[in-house]
From Swiss-Prot:
Heme-dependent dioxygenase that catalyzes the oxidative cleavage of the L-tryptophan (L-Trp) pyrrole ring and converts L-tryptophan to N-formyl-L-kynurenine. Catalyzes the oxidative cleavage of the indole moiety. It comes from Drosophila persimilis (Fruit fly). GO terms for biological process: L-tryptophan catabolic process to acetyl-CoA; L-tryptophan catabolic process to kynurenine; ommochrome biosynthetic process; protein homotetramerization. Heme binds at residue 313. Keywords: Dioxygenase, Heme, Iron, Metal-binding, Oxidoreductase, Tryptophan catabolism. GO terms for molecular function: heme binding; metal ion binding; tryptophan 2,3-dioxygenase activity. Its cofactor is heme. It catalyses: L-tryptophan + O2 = N-formyl-L-kynurenine. Pathway: Amino-acid degradation; L-tryptophan degradation via kynurenine pathway; L-kynurenine from L-tryptophan: step 1/2; Pigment biosynthesis; ommochrome biosynthesis. InterPro entries: Trp/Indoleamine_2_3_dOase-like, Trp_2_3_dOase. Homotetramer. Dimer of dimers. Binds 1 heme group per subunit. The keyword Nucleotide-binding does not apply. This is Tryptophan 2,3-dioxygenase.
Length: 380
């Protein structure tokens, strides 16, 4: 069957009219397939002991790296668009579109793991000796993705050495790592964007003050309900639960407590950015906050899918080499990979925890006419 985009879609029409009379590259030349399809060098074959599944191993990891390259391409373009004082609705729509593309790519990468799992541990052992000292830990592009997303160096789990040391004397790789560490990450740019959320201004709608008042009223109403509980033990339990909730809310209303949690690594956003994220979450049904809410949701999807990919990778490694063997690059293998599943690698952790601070819909402060008019004319 011929490509429908190459002619008029008629498989039997040998006189297809070309789209252009200009001389161009044919399919294989344009995609440089001669280089791409000749890049699978099986070391077992060179050793005259060819192992069939080594070919699958190479192809799968090369496919990962190609998709990593596309993710970096999308992240860089998104960071460029976010790096502005004002982001109009058109740009927000484009950012949402490209983040969604990254989400779909990551879903594809997660689904690639079962293909590798068609290889048995014994099959893998047949060629594993050829891999050392190579290791997935040495994937430069995955490290760049982490840094561009916002994984902090101090949050990383160390294994024997700093993560960038595995690139040794590769100055080009080290330069790329350094640049990715010092350039504004997606986390930093999203934080700046959230800090500008309209409605946070103390001289205007002052959402944060209204939210605190709503929380106080909500908790006071809960106390009244608890006090009517006839069973003393149940009443005390309810009152204790309300006090715990009050402490949780206090952690976002007191800037000093919030800052302490940031320094401890339990929160990522600045206090102002967290306020913006909560406001967007509450008013996501408002037209002006619809796209920003989609953007925040997609950031959580990206974090979730990377975690899911890490988890699938961990399970596959345990299945292939067990829990005690070292990785081919000298890491602790399964133990190291399992440690990367913690929240310290979750960049947009604060977005996942927003549900902790929700209040009933009827308690959410209503938008007044002034802020509604402002939202009509102001980009977020």
């Amino acid at each position: 069957m011929s490509c429908p985009y190459a002619g008029n879609g008629n498989d039997h029409d040998d006189a297809a009219v070309p789209l252009s009379t200009e001389v161009g590259k044919i399919y294989g030349e344009y995609l440089m397939l001669d280089k791409l399809l000749d890049a699978q060098c099986m070391l077992s074959t060179e050793d005259k002991r060819p192992v069939h599944d080594e070919h699958l191993f190479i192809i799968t990891h090369q496919a990962y790296e190609l998709w990593f390259k596309q993710i970096i391409f999308e992240f860089d373009s998104i960071r460029d668009m976010l790096d502005a004082e004002v982001i109009d609705e058109t740009k927000t729509l484009e950012i949402v579109k490209r983040l969604n593309r990254v989400v779909l790519i990551l879903k594809l990468l997660v689904d690639q793991v079962p293909i590798l799992e068609t290889m048995t541990p014994l099959d893998f052992m047949d060629f594993r000796k050829y891999l050392a000292p190579a290791s997935g830990f040495q994937s430069l592009q995955f490290r760049l993705i982490e840094n561009k997303l916002g994984v902090l160096t101090e949050q990383r789990v160390r294994y024997n050495q700093k993560y960038s040391d595995v690139f040794g004397g590769d100055e080009q790789a080290l330069s790329a790592i350094r640049s990715s560490e010092y350039e504004p990450s997606l986390l930093e740019l999203v934080q700046r964007w959230l800090e500008r959320t309209p409605g946070l201004e103390e001289s205007g709608f002052n959402f944060w003050k209204k939210f605190q008042q709503s929380v106080d009223q909500f908790l006071a109403a809960q106390v009244e309900i608890a006090m009517e509980e006839p069973v003393e033990q149940a009443k005390n339990y309810r009152l204790m639960d309300i006090e715990k909730r009050r402490e949780v809310y206090h952690s976002i209303f007191d800037p000093a407590v919030h800052e302490a949690l940031v320094k401890r690594g339990d929160r990522r956003f600045s206090h102002r950015a967290l306020q913006g994220a909560i406001m967007i979450t509450f008013y996501r049904d408002e037209p002006r906050f619809s796209q920003p809410h989609q953007l925040l949701t997609l950031l959580m999807d990206i974090d979730s899918l990377i975690t899911k990919w890490r988890y699938n990778h961990v399970i596959m490694v345990q299945r292939m080499i067990g829990s005690q063997q070292l990785g081919t690059g000298g890491s602790s293998g399964y133990q190291y990979l399992r440690s990367t599943l913690s929240d310290r690698y979750k960049v947009f952790l604060d977005l996942f925890n927003l549900s902790t601070f929700l209040i009933p819909r009827e308690a959410i402060p209503p938008l007044d006419e002034t802020i509604r008019k402002k939202l009509v004319h102001k980009s977020v």
